[in-house]
Amino acid sequence: MSKSKFERKKPHINVGTIGHVDHGKTTLTAALTRILSEQYGGEFRAYDQIDNAPEERERGITIATSHVEYETEERHYAHVDCPGHADYVKNMITGAAQMDGAVLVVSAADGPMPQTREHILLARQVGVPFILVYLNKADMVDDPELLELVEMEVRELLDSYQFPGDDTPIVVGSALKALEGDTSEIGIPSILKLVEQMDAYIPEPQRAVDQPFLMPIEDVFSISGRGTVVTGRVERGIVKVGEEIEIVGMRETQKTICTGVEMFRKLLDEGRAGDNVGVLLRGTKREDVERGQVLAKPKSITPHTKFYAEVYVLSKDEGGRHTPFFTGYRPQFYFRTTDVTGAIDLPDGVEMVMPGDNIQMTVSLIAPIAMEEGLRFAVREGGRTVGAGVVSKVIE
């Protein structure tokens, strides 16, 4: 088995397989690594190597995930596959594996099943922007009309969660046949067709440095004769000396000017995504700024108190609660650098939430936070993490 190193010149895309248990997600993942490693180098990972995924701890949550990588003509892909349904739920909500696109695997023999629906809903809630479909196990279906029927069902299901069902690429094949080296249409060619569609359908994500500037404030200092300095790690974009920026969250949005950027005691012209910097703010008093606010490019992000969220509640074994909670529960919501108290409303018909569940809820915070869809947070009680969530929609 050749272990040739990847050239890192190609654009990098994060993807993953989603879909119902036993529809063939892991077999497809193995087939992708086998066929593409033969074409473009990289490492073939067998089914059982992928299936016994190591457990990782992400923000105190135990998630089993397999990471594989492969290359196409155009791109380098990092691909995640999870052994169990609960792992998918946790993975998608915590953002442990942020996906630029997902491959939904549906067994042609069974059609869409409950987790097919649940994974599409999760993808919608957590902001996975693009879904492609691999209609698997086509070798078990003799009737072409049945295939068409399943394809129609999948497209309608995607539509019902606001994905463009009619325009979604659907590739019919058999991951197992492809893995076994079958060269008929449903074998290896179906895998090559799938990656061709991935290259074409999933756009290259915008790099962090090209996005609008945002820096969560971690600390605030007053330097005599210089003014107020805030420190933090630039999450995205670039801030240049002399630019106008906004301070957003916790209170009224304020405008200020960046008059200096400092890193490791050196003065810079700019701070870029990934840098830990101190930013000097003109005319801003120390008491006007606090941890939990963000510095941002003007008008790029707004403060909100009320939102819909998808939340995973830690199980007792993960150090979470031992008892359920109900509507009106008031924990802290930890966004970026700080905790804000909020009250939760459960959906109609949901009495309570048990540890280990995932749930859609409405949250009302007591102070506004700079927020947008896709923002991750932790749910805490007195400093202990009891849940993880993602903002699925801002309300007000």
Swiss-Prot record:
Residue numbers spanned by region G1: 19-26
Binding site for Mg(2+): 26
Location of the tr-type G domain: 10-206
Region (G3): 81-84
Compartments, record wording: Cytoplasm
Function, as annotated: GTP hydrolase that promotes the GTP-dependent binding of aminoacyl-tRNA to the A-site of ribosomes during protein biosynthesis.
Signal peptide (from-to): none
InterPro entries for the chain: EF-Tu_GTP-bd, EF-Tu_GTPase, EFTu-like_2, EFTU_2, G_TR_CS, P-loop_NTPase, Small_GTP-bd, T_Tr_GTP-bd_dom
Gene: tuf1
Region ranges (G2): 60-64
Catalytic activity field: GTP + H2O = GDP + phosphate + H(+)
Region (G5): 174-176
PANTHER family attached to this UniProt entry: ELONGATION FACTOR TU, MITOCHONDRIAL, ELONGATION FACTOR TU-RELATED
Chain spans, region G4: 136-139
Keyword list, A-Z: Cytoplasm, Elongation factor, GTP-binding, Hydrolase, Magnesium, Metal-binding, Nucleotide-binding, Protein biosynthesis
Top-level taxon in the UniProt lineage: Bacteria
Residues where GTP binds: 19-26, 81-85, 136-139
Principal localisation: cytoplasm
Family (UniProt): Belongs to the TRAFAC class translation factor GTPase superfamily. Classic translation factor GTPase family. EF-Tu/EF-1A subfamily.
Gene Ontology molecular function: GTP binding; GTPase activity; guanosine tetraphosphate binding; translation elongation factor activity
Protein name: Elongation factor Tu
Family annotation (PROSITE patterns): G_TR_1 (PS00301), G_TR_2 (PS51722)
Enzyme class: hydrolase
